[in-house]
């Protein structure tokens, strides 16, 4: 009954604290069936104690009871209280409270059981899929190669453990490396879209979005911009013009001045250097947290694309001999920027790098282990599933993933479907040996620690009494921040224990204060300084931060630490070095005891000023300590261990001096010059990618093959080898069809290259051949018809009504039309023919869910025979989307998967050979109830390292598998890049629902018209199911979206007039 005695004590404490009923419900996210109706209020209150809006003793005691005692003890307590049957209000409340806590404990146990079952099932699925992938790849693996794989894995582990290239150990080495790369003119794009980002006076710690990542990306951009070989660096972020933030965050561009131009000086051009470029997207007058940015990501991508295109032209004139200078790499930071970088990388066909900073799956696992919230509750608060899907997309699209530590690779990225360390090593070994990977790809994981600027740091020598030794023996004026800190202390000369972190629960500052307060010897020997961001009024801080700060103040009062703890309200970013100097002058210690620290940049900063460290052993500090060897690692949950480590360092002068010396000796392994060298060395290993129609050789000679005319004239000759013959393909097998298509393509391409080689402008081609595709450049507006949720007859009628509504503009040529569909081009042709619509009524056709882009052709010479279709395919578009396309290896896996699904005797999926193309593998769904939702199919492909975009179409009756970065929305961006069709001048017409890529058609800077009415098909649950809600990714209240009932010409005309596409009737 000892357990029950503790429970009784806690229950009495809860009653004394008051508000028990509400606190109990909040402590575990509610209880009983009625709790489900509380909606968002319950979700917000169900945050764990250290992340809630206000400190509550009742919540604390409830959580202690639920987490610390067995369900049986709780049941016995309830039985005892129920048996008392006392009419007193207190006993009645005690009985009710005991029952509710008992049920909450049962709920917690149930959640834990469900999560354990889910994880076990997930492990089995991964093992099965990866065994299949390993067996598939081992078919042609020789015994010698199998043996070599072991050595490869070992060497890879050693390389990743080191986490960096050999460091630049001297100024001579730096200068030698600089001279080797000075002739390069690289353009690098970095992306970090949340938080408040500016080059000077950064408001670090103002909120949870403005922390270490902000400082890292700014300093990385600054350092890269000063590195030889780099001409320009753009750090793209969000433009914020909100009244509650400084005006500087609304400036479109901010130049980052180099910290040290001596070592990294190079010839500066007109647009060279590093810049913060702020792209307007989302609410113009609001500063919103990162969880609310997801619906606006595509708008950012479109704005960033415009900037990059403009800058590429400018740099082409300055350093590219007139040719566009594309970014050598696009580097996303955190999941939201990674999602943006993936789309930009796909649109521009340039390599992508990703740095996670913190990862969604790791956070989800930690929250689920606590058992206080369900998966749905966590997702509602943090939009965690949308974040995880973005991180999975980053694995699909990135060539390199940069991490700070080895732990992040093994323990955090290992949680993702798209990454497996063992398979990554095998694939890399096969690539080195030239062995087929069967369409499988894995990004390269590289541990590269963040850098730091040391040029302005001059650690002072400290004598045995703790006084600074000046060369002239005279003192110097103390910085003002010293007085702001020392006014808190009754004895300011005692060694200072310094913690610098925002008041966030995961920073674990409350445990530090407890450790300090309960260790009498430490209190007598040292002072504690807590630099916890900036604040004016505690009640005006965010709820989470104010709760933590209130807890700290109460602990200071509890342990009577007045005169021993400093917690200044304000400090400037420029004063942080002075704070480090003060701690070093007093022979103090720097501490970071966060529960998990992804890297720990402040530990490096402190070491640079001669401060030993005490740091958490969870995460990046482990790697930092391995290099610097300047302190002690501790368990952040063990306050006694924290206190003993601090006491040991401040009390042992020899140990303190040795740790200080080690840190200063090794600190330059974390310098920005070395970081940039390692970074650019990795970038240099990437295969250059850029749009293929750009001429890559000497610009003084204009080659016909590089002109837009020849690019599409060769397309005429190949003329859509998607089996344009309508009557010969059905009888052939897939293998023979593909072989014949390839042979025909080679022959016709050869004829096109060798015959009639003459320079011809786009305009001349239009005049001589009658082709309409160049007209895209001259359209003022483009109407994109992308309606998936209607029958063919309704779609034909909608097209005709749109033509009628815009008849005047059609005749004048100011408005053009694009049909965007999941159909193959042969199906499009049949649809148009059935409705009496000419192909030339459209400027372009986006087919096969965005894997093919075609243009109409009215010239009979363009067609290979009368049976072939009047379309031309854009081969340049294929070069844009072919990145990581698995081809025949992917097709083989899909066929096996479809066969496995049909093992029960009933056919579930059948390959649709007619509608498949080189970059689209199409299936017909025979049994919609037996096929998994898209998220499960994507998961299956990712586990096997197959990178593709899987989507259901035609109300779930068809399945298309296309390249991972191909989509109908990406095809619209290609039209902008290739032909200059402004995205803001496009209007996309959609239904109320659509294919599983529907969300991509709604976001962005283009206008959107949604057709509502009973003619829309009811979404099929198979393809409508997603891991996150549509509202998490689409903002339906943005100005560019409107809805109309039906699809009559008058309603359509009114909507088009609303967006300024049509002129009002005079």
Swiss-Prot record:
The keyword Repressor does not apply. Plays a role in photosynthetic sucrose synthesis by catalyzing the rate-limiting step of sucrose biosynthesis from UDP-glucose and fructose- 6-phosphate. Involved in the regulation of carbon partitioning in the leaves of plants. May regulate the synthesis of sucrose and therefore play a major role as a limiting factor in the export of photoassimilates out of the leaf. Plays a role for sucrose availability that is essential for plant growth and fiber elongation. Homodimer or homotetramer. The lineage of its organism: Eukaryota, Viridiplantae, Streptophyta, Embryophyta, Tracheophyta. It is an enzyme of class 2 (transferase). GO terms for biological process: sucrose biosynthetic process. Induction: Circadian-regulated, with the highest expression 1 hour after the beginning of dark period (in 14 hours light/10 hours dark cycle). Belongs to the glycosyltransferase 1 family. The gene is SPS4. InterPro entries: Glyco_trans_1, SPP-like_dom, SPS, SPS_C, SPS_pln, Sucrose_synth_GT-B1. Pathway: Glycan biosynthesis; sucrose biosynthesis; sucrose from D-fructose 6-phosphate and UDP-alpha-D-glucose: step 1/2. SUPFAM superfamilies: UDP-Glycosyltransferase/glycogen phosphorylase. Keywords: Glycosyltransferase, Transferase. It catalyses: beta-D-fructose 6-phosphate + UDP-alpha-D-glucose = sucrose 6(F)-phosphate + UDP + H(+). The keyword Glycosyltransferase applies. This is Probable sucrose-phosphate synthase 4.
């Amino acid at each position: 009954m000892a357990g029950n005695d503790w429970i009784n004590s806690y229950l009495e404490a809860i009653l004394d604290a008051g508000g028990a009923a509400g606190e109990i419900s909040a402590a575990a996210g509610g209880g009983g069936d009625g709790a489900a109706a509380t909606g968002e209020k319950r979700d917000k209150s169900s945050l764990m104690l250290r992340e809630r809006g206000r400190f509550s003793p009742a919540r604390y005691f409830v959580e202690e009871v639920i987490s610390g005692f067995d369900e049986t003890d709780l049941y016995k307590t309830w039985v005892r209280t129920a048996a008392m049957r006392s009419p007193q209000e207190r006993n009645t409340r005690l009985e009710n409270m005991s029952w509710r806590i008992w049920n909450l404990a049962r709920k917690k146990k149930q959640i834990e059981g469900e999560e354990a079952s889910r994880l076990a099932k997930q492990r089995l699925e991964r093992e099965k899929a990866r065994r299949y992938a390993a067996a598939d790849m081992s078919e042609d693996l020789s015994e010698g190669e199998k043996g070599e794989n072991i050595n490869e894995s070992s060497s890879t582990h050693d390389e990743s453990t080191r986490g960096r290239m050999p460091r630049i150990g001297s100024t001579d080495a730096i200068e030698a490396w600089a001279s080797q790369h000075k002739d390069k003119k690289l353009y690098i794009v970095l992306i970090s879209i949340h938080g408040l980002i500016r080059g000077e006076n950064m408001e670090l710690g103002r909120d949870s979005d403005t922390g270490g990542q902000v400082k890292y990306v700014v300093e990385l951009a600054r350092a890269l911009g000063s590195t030889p070989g780099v001409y320009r660096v753009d750090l793209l972020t969000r433009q914020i013009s909100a009244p509650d933030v400084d005006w500087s965050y609304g400036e479109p561009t901010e130049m980052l001045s180099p910290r040290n131009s001596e070592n990294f000086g190079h010839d500066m051009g007109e647009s060279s250097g590093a810049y913060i470029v702020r792209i307007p997207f989302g609410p113009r007058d609001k500063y919103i947290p990162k969880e609310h940015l997801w619906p606006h990501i595509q708008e950012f991508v479109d704005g960033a694309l415009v900037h990059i295109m403009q800058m590429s032209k400018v740099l082409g004139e300055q350093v590219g001999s007139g040719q566009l200078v594309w970014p050598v790499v696009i580097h996303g930071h955190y999941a939201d920027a990674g999602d943006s970088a993936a789309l930009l990388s796909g649109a521009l066909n340039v390599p992508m790098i990703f740095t996670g900073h913190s990862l969604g799956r790791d956070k989800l696992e930690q929250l689920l282990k606590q058992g206080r919230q369900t998966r749905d509750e966590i997702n509602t608060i943090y939009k965690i599933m949308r974040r995880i899907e973005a991180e999975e997309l980053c694995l699909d699209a990135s060539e390199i993933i940069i991490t700070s530590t080895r732990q992040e690779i093994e323990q955090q990225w290992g949680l993702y479907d798209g990454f497996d360390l063992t398979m990554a090593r095998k694939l890399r070994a096969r690539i080195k040996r030239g062995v087929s990977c069967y369409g499988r790809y894995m990004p390269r994981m590289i541990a590269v620690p963040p850098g730091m600027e040391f040029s302005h740091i001059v650690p002072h020598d400290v004598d045995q009494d703790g006084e600074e030794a000046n060369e002239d023996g005279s003192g110097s004026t103390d910085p003002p921040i010293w007085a702001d800190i020392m006014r808190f202390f009754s004895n300011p000369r005692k060694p200072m224990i310094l913690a610098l972190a925002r008041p966030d629960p995961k920073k674990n500052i409350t445990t530090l204060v407890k450790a300090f307060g309960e260790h009498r010897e430490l209190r007598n020997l040292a002072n504690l300084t807590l630099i916890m961001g900036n604040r004016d009024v505690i009640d005006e801080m965010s709820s989470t931060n104010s709760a933590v700060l209130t807890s700290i103040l109460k602990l200071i009062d509890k342990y009577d630490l007045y005169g021993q703890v400093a917690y200044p309200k304000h400090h400037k970013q420029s004063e942080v070095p002075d704070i480090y100097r003060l701690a070093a002058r007093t022979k103090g210690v720097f501490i970071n005891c966060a529960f998990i620290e992804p890297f720990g940049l402040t530990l490096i900063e402190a070491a640079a000023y001669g401060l030993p460290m005490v740091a958490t052993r969870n995460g990046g500090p482990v790697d930092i300590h391995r290099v610097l060897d300047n302190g002690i690692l501790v368990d952040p949950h063990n306050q006694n261990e924290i206190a003993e480590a601090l006491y040991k360092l401040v009390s042992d002068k020899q140990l303190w001096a040795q740790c200080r010396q080690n840190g200063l000796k090794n600190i330059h392994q974390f310098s920005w010059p070395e970081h940039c060298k390692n970074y650019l060395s990795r970038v240099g290993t990437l295969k250059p990618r850029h749009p293929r129609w750009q001429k890559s050789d000497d610009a003084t000679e204009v080659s016909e093959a590089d002109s837009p005319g020849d690019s599409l004239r060769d397309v005429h000759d190949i003329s859509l080898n998607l089996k344009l013959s309508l009557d010969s393909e059905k009888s052939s097998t897939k293998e023979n069809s593909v072989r014949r298509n390839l042979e025909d393509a080679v022959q016709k391409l050869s004829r096109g290259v060798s015959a009639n080689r003459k320079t011809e402008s786009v305009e001349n081609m239009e005049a001589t051949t009658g082709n309409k595709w160049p007209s895209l450049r001259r359209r003022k507006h483009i109407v994109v018809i992308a309606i998936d949720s209607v029958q063919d007859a309704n779609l034909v009628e909608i097209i005709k009504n749109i033509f009628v509504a815009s008849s005047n503009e059609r005749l004048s040529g100011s408005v053009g039309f694009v049909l965007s569909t999941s159909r193959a081009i042969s199906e499009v042709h049949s649809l148009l023919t059935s409705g009496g619509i000419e192909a030339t009524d459209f400027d372009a056709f986006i087919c096969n869910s965005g894997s093919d882009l075609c243009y109409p052709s009215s010239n009979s010479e363009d067609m290979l025979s009368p049976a072939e279709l009047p379309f031309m395919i854009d081969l340049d578009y294929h070069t844009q989307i072919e990145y990581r396309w698995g081809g025949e290896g992917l097709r083989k896996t899909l066929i096996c998967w479809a066969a496995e699904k049909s093992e029960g005797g009933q056919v579930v999926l059948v390959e649709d050979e007619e509608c498949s193309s080189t970059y689209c593998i199409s299936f017909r769904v025979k049994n919609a109830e037996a096929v998994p939702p898209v998220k499960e199919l994507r998961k299956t492909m990712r586990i096997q390292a197959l990178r593709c975009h899987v989507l259901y179409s035609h109300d779930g009756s068809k399945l298309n598998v296309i390249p991972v970065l191909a989509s109908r929305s990406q095809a619209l961006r290609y039209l902008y890049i290739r032909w200059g069709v402004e995205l803001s001048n496009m209007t996309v017409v959609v239904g109320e629902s659509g294919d599983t890529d529907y969300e991509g058609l709604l976001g962005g800077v283009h206008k959107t018209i949604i057709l509502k009415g009973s003619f829309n098909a009811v979404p099929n649950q198979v393809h409508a199911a997603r891991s996150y809600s549509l509202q998490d990714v689409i903002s339906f209240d943005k100005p560019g979206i409107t809805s109309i009932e039906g699809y009559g010409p008058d309603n359509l005309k009114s909507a088009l007039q609303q967006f300024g596409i049509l002129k009002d009737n005079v």
